Amino acid sequence: MNKKIILICTICCGLAISGCNKASKNDAKAEVANTPVVKRDTLVAAPTKNTPEQILAKPEVPILCYHRITEGHEGTYTVTPATFAAHMKILADSGYHSISPDQLYDYLVYNKNLPEKPFMITFDDSRVEHSEIAAPTMEKYGFRGVFFIMTITYNKKNYMTTDQIAQLAKNGHTVGMHSWDHTMVTKYKDSIDWQKEVVAPKAKLETIIGKPVEYWAYPNGVYNHEGAEELSKYFKISFILSSKRDSIQPLQTVHRIITTECSPEKLLKTMNQTFKMK
């Protein structure tokens, strides 16, 4: 009788131990299953941004600035359609490649590579010939431009309609800001001015083109340090003309040259003489 009792106890203990082992294994599996998996991507460090000093030391990309493209209107800011076409042709024939502001930003900030002989074509003031003459001419050579919009001009005579602006964005061009009414940044006194000239027009323009507006051209190319600091909150790059660049905000003071009624050959010479390309 005692032997039977001992045998039964032994069997029960064995079953209990076996059950505990199974439970431990199941608990271990559950713990492994519930442990969060760290993806390899999350371990990759964010790319390091260049310092202002490093940005200023980089070779400049030639950036052209056009205003009027029309016949019968002489002045520093005007070129004829024939001259504009000749400019685009010699640039294409000379092996230049147009780049976007996004490419320029990545080059300046992250040292990304650019195509051989890069340059940028920009347009100020929203004039209708930018859509009707400049864009088709550029597209013929595979170029894309940057159109800085003065938003007070929407749908007015001699200026682009909102549909034309939206179409430029759809066709691969970049649409940027040129203020509401061309008031210079140096005259913005308070948050009311910034709301009127930058914040509200930027939001409206973004609804028109259906994408963020990340680039700015200073009215008259004029800036001050305070304005550059404030604009850095809204734009990746802001473009000046021939003024000295800001040592603290080089991205908000990128050089351009006003393109005049000149021969194609002179244009190339001016580009080489003006920009620190090496």
Which residues fall in each region the model found?
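Acidic (Asp/Glu)-rich catalytic clusters
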Residues: 134-143, 160-176, 232
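Cell-envelope/glycan interface and biosynthesis
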Residues: 131-132, 143-150, 158
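Sec-dependent N-terminal signal peptides
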Residues: 5-14
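Short beta-strand and adjacent tight-turn residues that come in two discontinuous sequence segments
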Residues: 148, 178, 240-241
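C-terminal motif of bacterial Sec signal peptides marking the signal peptidase cleavage site
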Residues: 16-19
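C-terminal active-site subregion of NodB/CE4 polysaccharide deacetylases
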Residues: 24-122, 127-129, 182, 186-278
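Charged helix-capping and loop-helix junction motifs
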Residues: 158-165, 192-197
